[in-house]
Each structure stands twice: as structure tokens, then as C-alpha cells.
Amino acid sequence: MRIDLSLKPTPVQFLKRLSEKYGFNIYVKRDDLTELVGSGNKIRKLEYLLWEALKKGATTVFTCGGLQSNHARATAYVSRRYGLKPVLFLRKGEKVLNGNLLLDILLGAEIVEVSPEEYERIDEIFDVHKKMREKKGEKVYVIPEGGSNSLGAFGYFNAVLEMKDQLNLESFDAIVCAVGSGGTIAGLSAGISFLEYHVPVVGVNVTTKNSDYFVGKVKRIISGMEEYGLRVNETVFEVVDDYRGPGYAIPSSEDVEILKEVASIEGIILDPVYTAKAFRGMIEMFRNSEKNVLFIHTGGIFGLFAQSRRLV
């Protein structure tokens, strides 16, 4: 029930120098290498969601995000690969014509800008626009923010099975990822539970919503996976709020320092919205613990360019 959009398996890399510096063993699942234009975690979810869109005979795909949304860019890209029309509902903000937004435009995506207030009721806006387009003969498939629903979560359920074949997952003390819309941590948690491993999944919240919101959402996503034939026992995950910094998509000075350090010491590029914050959180939580920790690099390199003034 998916189509193959990405380059898998992505490698797992041990960060020797940073592990020595911070006193625990840091391994990175390099999902920044899933593709080029489609790079990052979103394409794993889109393998399932685009499969369903094509199965239902869609001609047009709706999704949403910020102006520099990695998910919106990846959705536009895979839609064009399969001859579908991408319509991106993007939350208004500082418009910098580079990075993801530039790629959206090059891919010929139709962009509908919505205010932050309108974005809070994005499902209603989707419904209005969907009805208008379907009256004109289009068939619309709606993908939620981040591709984070029960079907999309199978992308990271499958990633767990992939990692099981790459390394001894049971030897890890934690798996860490950024949390932006909840689908990645849901899939990881479901996969670990399915394998009956006792490895906690720790999500570092980078949004303005609190951890209670995401705990509830992740549980609903995992519960909904039963509709597709997956039944799992109790999942072990947590979402922490302590490393969000000044706000969503606004890196703190500590985030910027971590981003630069990982680049200059290990040659890995993080992004200022998700992975730099999550990596900093991981370091603070596990410093000098001598534990084995697996970090999921969810990509986001194109988001660097719109924030160049904050980074140099």
C-alpha cells in the first residue's frame, strides 16, 4: 500500500567526535538522505499518502504548512512526479523567496496564502476549496499538515523495520526525534511496540503546542493504524517541551551553536526549525550518561537558506 519514492535504506552513522565530547554514544539515522528535492522524513509518509491519492483517482493534492514548509515542498515534488497538481495552503509570514518556497514555485505549485487565524481552521478552508474545485471536475485528495495521520505514520513504522535490519535496535537506550506534527514519532513508537522492543522514543517538541496535545494526537494516530491492519500493544514514548527556544522556526543562540558544531565537527547539516532544536535537546538530556542514543535526522536543509541572517 505504498509507492517507492525515496532512496532506502538510509545509512546510520556513528558520531565519534561528538560522542566523546558529550559522554554518550550518538548514532544518526540519516533520513536527510532519503532523496534530493524530496529529502527528509516527509517523503516516507508521502509514499503511503500518494499511493492512496492515486488509488482514489485524484487529480489534485492539497496540503498545508508554513511558507518554508519542508512537507509542502516534498508534497509538491512527489505530486509532480506522478502528474498531479499540488495546491499548497501556506501560513503567511516573512516571505523570503528561496529555500522551500523557491522550490514550490519552480515545481509549479499553486500557492494559497492564509493568515495565522485562518490556518487554525485549515480543515474548513480545505473543505471550501475542495468543493469549489470538484464542481469544476477536479478530484482532490487532502494530505494533512506534515503528512501526519494514521496512514502516513506507516512511513516511520516501516523505517523501524528498516533499522532493525541495520543495527541492534534493542541495544539503544532511546530514540530521539523532533516533533512538529506527530506522525514521525507515532510511526516510530508503533514500530518499536510491534517488535516488542523496550526502547523509549523521545520527541522534542519544536512547536507552540504543548506536549499534552502531542501525546493525545500520537495516541490517536497509532490507534487509527488499526484500520489498516496494525494492532500494537502499549507504546513507550514521551514528548518534551523544554527545547523549543524563542518560538516555532526561531532558533535560539544555543540552537545555532549546535547547528554549527555538528556541521564543523561531523560534517552533518542540521536545520534551524527541527533538527538543531532536537539535537540540542538530546545532548542536554543524555550528556555524560554513557548511553546509546539513536537520533533521527529528519532533513530540512532547504530551510537553512531563508534563515541565513540568523545563522551567520
From Swiss-Prot:
| E.C. code | 3.5.99.7
Q: Name one GO molecular function term.
A: 1-aminocyclopropane-1-carboxylate deaminase activity
* N6-(pyridoxal phosphate)lysine modified-residue sites: 42
Q: Which SUPFAM superfamilies match?
A: Tryptophan synthase beta subunit-like PLP-dependent enzymes
InterPro entries in UniProt: ACCD_DCysDesulf, D-Cys_desShydrase, TrpB-like_PALP, TrpB-like_PALP_sf
Q: Which UniProt keywords apply?
A: Hydrolase, Pyridoxal phosphate
What Pfam families does UniProt report for this protein, alphabetically? PALP
- Reaction(s) this enzyme catalyzes, per UniProt: 1-aminocyclopropane-1-carboxylate + H2O = 2-oxobutanoate + NH4(+)
Q: What are the names of the required cofactors? A: pyridoxal 5'-phosphate
The similarity annotation says: Belongs to the ACC deaminase/D-cysteine desulfhydrase family.
Concerning NCBIfam families, the annotation shows: ACC_deam_rel (TIGR01275)
What name goes with this protein?
Putative 1-aminocyclopropane-1-carboxylate deaminase
